[in-house]
């Protein structure tokens, strides 16, 4: 598997540093947390203690790059503990036969490596006609935590 950490961000269409700089230029307040590279929700839960407290909890998410039977590219964002049933999701978003997209297609369409999928990858995904679907309950979260295009950083 190709490394998805910030050490290799220069190989991405949009670097993590560039994304963070854009937030700052636009006056969007973010906090950046550096940690070991994490590729799964289980690994992510191990580093959450670095930045979570009773006052700064929030929405920890999982992100799935999917394709349907018609080759439509989809980014699904849900609460990290949500059980995902692709058949149910396919019905909800009016698609047929959802499956996980390949790592090559992930990079071509969202500009990130496996383990670093994030809503921020729509910075590349929009121009590649990737459709974004977010779980409604995430709107109730005070903060959302996501990778800024690499998997050894988290921003809120």
How should each PLM-predicted stretch be described?
Residues 1-156:
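Extended, low-hydrophobicity, polar/charged segments
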């Amino acid at each position: 598997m190709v490394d998805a950490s910030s050490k290799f961000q220069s190989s991405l269409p949009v670097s993590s540093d560039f994304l963070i700089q854009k937030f700052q230029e636009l006056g969007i307040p973010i906090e950046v947390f550096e940690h070991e590279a994490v590729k799964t929700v289980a690994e992510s839960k191990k580093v959450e203690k670095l930045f979570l407290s009773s006052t700064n909890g929030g929405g920890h998410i999982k992100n799935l790059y999917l394709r349907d039977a018609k080759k439509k590219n989809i980014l699904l964002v849900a609460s990290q503990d949500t059980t995902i049933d692709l058949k149910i999701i396919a019905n909800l978003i009016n698609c047929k036969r959802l499956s996980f997209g390949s790592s090559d297609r992930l990079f071509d369409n969202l500009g990130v490596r496996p383990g670093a999928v994030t809503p921020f990858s729509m910075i590349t995904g929009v121009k590649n006609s990737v459709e974004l679907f977010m779980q409604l309950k995430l709107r109730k979260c005070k903060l959302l935590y996501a990778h800024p295009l690499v998997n050894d950083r988290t921003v809120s």
